[in-house]
């Protein structure tokens, strides 16, 4: 049931500016500097299978179907990323984005009532640079930091709107930045995805019926541990934060569909509109396939959204602003378009904001992509999972004759891989390194599945590197054997204790 439409004051985005580093780093950088990182991938001739509706898929199935086409690419769909050059600073980039938004709105810094800043991984370690930013811009108004990982932009917009709604302030400058390239080791494949950028917007009163209509924000605490951050010294002895894939990375895949459906559907109810009425959708895209997952989860047409991942890589909290900017620049949205923006911030919040787009002024366009990739997403053909997928449990393995246990276990693993990669079982070659089949998220998903089904713990390192399916099968079998042996003494001790008690009773 659709509720009545929002009657709140028309407050939303008045102007929008973005800023990106001058350096556009392509895959050639790693191919030339670290050729050993770039592996040739096995040939994967996909079988033709019948298409089925996305409504029959659970969240992980849908995710794995969209990941699968990228696994044959050594760079997993990464094409370009903008990274800070030696003569650039994170502060400069933020100032440029803010200046673009101010100029587009034809406002002076003295006219800004409040500034809200969300800066992820800026130059100054351990502290945000809001004060330095306000000082460099010449702001005299209150300014503070707000952070909710990749949902920071929408959370900041929600806060700015609320402050203006209560008439505490007349307008707000929101500045959002992400400098992921600073936090990853170049020889870590996670570096292939990390980009840098900044965006800014002026939040103000708009024409009647325009602006933000509703928000829905939920906790993503279930994804805590998806990324691991640690402090280390760089090559010149300067401390820095290093980001790596965490032990709970599989939760990103397992929860993605539920979060996007919950936020978008409930935001629509609050706004008094249906999802079918949305003219254009904007998703944050931390992976090449993320927009596809969201589009399929909500059953919307691909031409009603945009995917800039191939242009920017993962720019975190900046994505909603960059996507809105490019969508407006490319005339995909216009004044009075009904727009839904969705973001998912790991270990923080997922958020959906529905707005009636106003006459938004845009700052100077960033340098164009050099890869000439389309921004309209292309959905992969949905292929059904094998209905004969093997269900395995610890008792089932132990019930099999010892000489057949390894074969039973290998069949279980091959079936999981075949279904996840949309291959036929005979296409899975057990002697190839697992890294040829799995990206990091799928490796954690397989780890989680094994530990749930078989009640044993397997270190993540055994799913990566040069380990192959045969190695993994033998390791799991060894763990099961040890686990079973550990149970036997406790049972025997209990039986012995009962016998001793019987003897004592008889002797008495």
Stretches with model-predicted labels:
Residues 241-303, 307-309, 390-399:
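A contiguous, well-structured pocket-lining segment that forms one wall/lid of small-molecule binding clefts
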Residues 13-15, 101, 115, 156, ...:
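Conserved small-residue
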Residues 387-508:
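Phosphopantetheine-dependent thiolation modules in NRPS/PKS and related acyl-activating systems
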Residues 2-88, 188-254, 262, 356-381:
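Condensing-enzyme catalytic core mediating Claisen C-C bond formation in acyl metabolism
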Residues 167-198:
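Flexible, glycine-rich active-site loops centered on histidine and acidic residues
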Residues 66, 70, 82-148, 267-291:
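Conserved beta-ketoacyl condensing-enzyme motif
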Residues 14-17, 147, 172-178, 203, ...:
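Short beta-strand segments
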Residues 5, 91, 95, 121-122, ...:
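Claisen-condensing/thiolase-fold acyl-transfer catalytic domains that form or cleave C-C bonds
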């Amino acid at each position: 049931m659709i509720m009545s439409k929002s009657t709140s004051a028309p407050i939303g985005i008045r102007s929008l500016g973005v800023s990106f580093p001058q350096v556009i780093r392509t895959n050639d950088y790693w191919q030339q500097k670290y050729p050993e990182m770039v592996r040739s991938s096995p040939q994967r001739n996909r079988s033709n299978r019948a298409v089925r509706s996305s409504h029959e898929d659970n969240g992980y199935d849908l995710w794995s179907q969209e990941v699968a086409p990228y696994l044959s690419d050594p760079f997993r769909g990464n094409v370009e990323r903008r990274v800070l050059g030696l003569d650039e600073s994170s502060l400069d980039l933020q100032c440029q984005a803010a200046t673009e938004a101010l100029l587009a709105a034809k406002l002076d810094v003295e006219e800004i009532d409040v500034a809200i800043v969300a800066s992820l991984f800026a130059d100054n370690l351990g502290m945000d640079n809001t004060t330095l930013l306000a000082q460099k811009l010449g702001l005299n108004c209150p300014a503070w930091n707000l952070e909710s990982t990749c949902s920071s932009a929408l959370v900041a917009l929600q806060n700015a709107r609320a402050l203006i709604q209560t008439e505490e302030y007349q307008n707000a400058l929101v500045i959002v930045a992400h400098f992921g390239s600073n936090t990853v080791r170049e020889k870590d494949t996670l570096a292939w995805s990390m980009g840098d950028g900044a965006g800014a917007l002026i939040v103000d009163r708009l024409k009647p019926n325009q602006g933000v209509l509703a928000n829905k924000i939920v906790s993503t605490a279930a994804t805590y541990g998806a990324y691991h951050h640690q402090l280390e010294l760089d090559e010149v002895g300067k401390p820095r934060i290093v980001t790596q894939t965490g032990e709970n990375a599989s939760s990103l895949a397992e929860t993605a569909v539920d979060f996007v459906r919950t936020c978008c559907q409930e935001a629509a109810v609050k706004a008094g509109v249906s999802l079918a009425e949305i003219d254009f959708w904007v998703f944050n895209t931390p992976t090449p396939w993320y927009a596809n997952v969201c589009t399929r989860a909500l059953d919307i047409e691909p031409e009603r959204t945009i995917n800039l991942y191939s242009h920017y890589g993962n720019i975190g909290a900046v994505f909603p602003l960059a996507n809105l900017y490019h969508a407006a620049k490319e005339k995909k949205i216009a004044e009075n378009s009904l727009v839904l923006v969705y973001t998912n911030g790991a270990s923080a919040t997922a958020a959906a904001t529905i707005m009636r787009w106003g006459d938004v002024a845009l700052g100077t366009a960033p340098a164009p992509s050099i890869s000439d990739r389309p921004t309209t997403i292309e959905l992969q053909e949905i292929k059904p999972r094998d209905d004969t997928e093997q269900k395995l449990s610890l008792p089932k393995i132990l019930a099999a004759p010892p000489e057949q246990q390894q074969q039973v276990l290998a069949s279980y693993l091959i079936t999981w891989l075949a279904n996840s990669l949309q291959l036929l079982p005979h296409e899975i070659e057990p002697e190839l390194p697992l890294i040829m089949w799995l990206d990091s998220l799928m490796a954690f998903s397989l780890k989680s599945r094994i530990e749930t089904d078989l009640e044993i713990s397997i270190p993540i390192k055994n799913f990566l590197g040069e380990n192959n399916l045969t190695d993994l099968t033998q390791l799991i079998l060894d763990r099961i054997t040890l686990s079973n042996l550990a149970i036997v003494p406790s049972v025997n001790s209990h039986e012995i204790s009962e016998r001793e008690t019987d003897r004592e009773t008889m002797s008495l």
